[in-house]
């Protein structure tokens, strides 16, 4: 009877109460149980008061109760019904897995952005290349046009400078036709006197007149020589005037150009006169004079060295950009584009 009553009384007790009674029978304190089980005193107190800590999972709580029961020598089978009530197994809340659609969407958006960036980059590179090619082609066409224009001007100048056919018909000197026969004695007397030859006049290269020997004889015979006839034999020859030779003075506005490679250029002075227009070969040089300021067009600035008023002209800005040089040289040597 006493055994059955004790069994019924144990069943009436909760799990926490049975663990507390067993601890007190063994003379253990909550602090001693907490130290042996490596638990907090508050956790041991919650177990004895049948409280389930909110921050403690049911699996851990059941494990702590079993360890406590073994410590106070209570069979685990007797505590199982109470464990189901005090610490029921709760289904773990599984957090829903985050879909990868967001990552895929972001990756797709990044892919479109990268594609658009590359497309813009290719368009910029293509436009830059097209602009450079058009500029280069325009410069080449301009140089070709200027060269053709120069060739046309040179050909027209050569056609205008062709020699005109000369009239070589012999003209009769009226002095020789009207000379009476008595002039023969005069010419005979002249043959005995020393003949003073006058210096031959300079021949103009622009004149293409040709004098025949017969005309030269007629002119010599027609020239009166009374002075030679009256000059005694021992007299000194008549003094002749000698043309004074003058050294040309260097023009302060002279434009000197030396060429290190083939180059096309055109030079115009202030009056609009073209001092030069055409091609200059390598190692050539030009020395031009005119009325300042000069206007220059140079197809290859790197191939020419210019000196104006004895000072070099800076063409570096045209050489760096590799373009046709257009500049004006004024009296103060300040080239302006």
UniProtKB/Swiss-Prot annotation:
Residues 133-337 are periplasmic. Residues 1-111 are cytoplasmic. Residues 145-167, 208-218 have a biased composition (Polar residues). The chain crosses the membrane at residues 112-132. The keyword Cell inner membrane applies. Residues 168-207, 219-236 have a biased composition (Low complexity). Residues 19-71 form the HTH cro/C1-type domain. Disulfide bonds: none annotated. Pfam families: HTH_25 (PF13413), RodZ_C (PF13464). Keywords: Cell inner membrane, Cell membrane, Cell shape, DNA-binding, Membrane, Signal-anchor, Transmembrane, Transmembrane helix. This is Cytoskeleton protein RodZ. It comes from Escherichia coli O157:H7. The gene is rodZ.
């Amino acid at each position: 009877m006493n055994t059955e009553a004790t069994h019924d009384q144990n069943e009436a007790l909760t799990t926490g109460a049975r663990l507390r009674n067993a601890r007190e029978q063994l003379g253990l304190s909550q602090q001693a149980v907490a130290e042996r089980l490596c638990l907090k005193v508050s956790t041991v107190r919650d177990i004895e008061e049948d409280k389930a800590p909110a921050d403690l999972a049911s699996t851990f709580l059941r494990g702590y109760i079993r360890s406590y029961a073994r410590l106070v020598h209570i069979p685990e089978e007797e505590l199982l019904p109470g464990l189901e009530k005090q610490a029921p197994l709760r289904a773990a809340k599984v957090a829903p897995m985050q879909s990868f659609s967001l990552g895929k969407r972001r990756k797709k958006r990044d892919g479109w952005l990268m594609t658009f960036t590359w497309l813009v980059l290719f368009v910029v590179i293509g436009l830059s290349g097209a602009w450079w090619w058009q500029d280069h082609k325009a410069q080449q066409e301009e140089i070709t046009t200027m060269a053709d224009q120069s060739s046309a001007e040179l050909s027209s100048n050569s056609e205008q400078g062709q020699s005109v056919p000369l009239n070589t018909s012999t003209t009769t000197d009226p002095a020789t036709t009207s000379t009476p026969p008595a002039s023969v004695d005069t010419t005979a007397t002249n043959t005995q006197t020393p003949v003073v030859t006058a210096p031959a006049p300079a021949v103009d290269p622009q004149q293409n007149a040709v004098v025949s020997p017969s005309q030269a004889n007629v002119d010599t015979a027609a020239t009166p020589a009374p002075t030679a006839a009256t000059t005694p034999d021992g007299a000194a020859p008549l003094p002749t005037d000698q043309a004074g030779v003058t050294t040309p003075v260097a023009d302060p506005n002279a434009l000197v150009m030396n060429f290190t490679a083939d180059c096309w250029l055109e030079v115009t002075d202030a009056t609009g006169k073209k001092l030069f227009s055409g091609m200059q070969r390598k190692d050539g040089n030009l020395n031009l004079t005119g009325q300042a300021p000069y206007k220059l067009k140079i197809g290859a600035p790197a191939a020419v060295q210019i000196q104006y008023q004895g000072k070099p002209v800076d063409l570096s800005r045209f050489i760096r950009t590799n373009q046709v040089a257009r500049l004006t040289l004024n009296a103060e040597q300040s080239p302006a584009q």
